[in-house]
Amino acid sequence: MIQGKLARLGNVISADKCVDYLLNRPKLEMVGLGLIYGHPGLGKTTYAQRIAYSRGYIYLRLEAWMTAKTFAVALKKAVLQHLGMGNNPVIGSAASIYNSLIGLLAEHPEVVIVIDEIDYAFKEQKILSAIRDIVDETLAVVILVGMQNAKDRLYQINRYYFDRCGVFCEFQSPSKKDIAILAATVMEVKFGADIVDYIYKRNQGTLRDTIKLIHSLESVAKVKNLGQISVHDLEG
């Protein structure tokens, strides 16, 4: 199986459009805040990491133990490294760190920050407030990535915060077209529509299981020395 390729699946295309919309928004009228959300196993984290790497964005993953202070420290470190300003210790109160961070981002409006596992912030709402202040007081773009109920949780916690989000992108289960595109991108053996149907019926609606099935199909093809695989090759 070919490694390291990001297939242009429906979720990737939709998420790219949402990110580009935020980048090209009327900046003085709309804050740069968006949310990518969806069920586990649909490729949200893979997308977040790869778009950050490929476009030169900052990627930060929230941890369950993070407080407003530790988040401030982690984010400021990431911003300083991104801007080539060294790796010095970040000290001071949470308020002073956030103030200096907002000052940095105000001077560098091109910065884009991807924050994964935003669900952990729902129990530490000071983190959510800090993110809101960043997008309210600077032109930076912040893309939140969370689970399937993240959109509803934001609405329940703070309607004003919910309204600040300029775009919402829900990751969906892979379609047959997505499976065909992914298989064509990563499989090293040929296949037909029967294999696409086979995967679609067994992937539990997730990209993660789709990839596992593709790997198992390639293993069968390798053992049987096949250049093309069909459902009939899986029998017996």
Positions of PLM-derived features:
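Loop/turn-to-beta-strand initiation segments
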Residues: 108-112, 137-145
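Conserved P-loop NTPase "ATPase switch" module shared by AAA+ and STAND
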Residues: 4, 101-124
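Central P-loop NTPase core of STAND/AAA+ ATPases
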Residues: 81-108
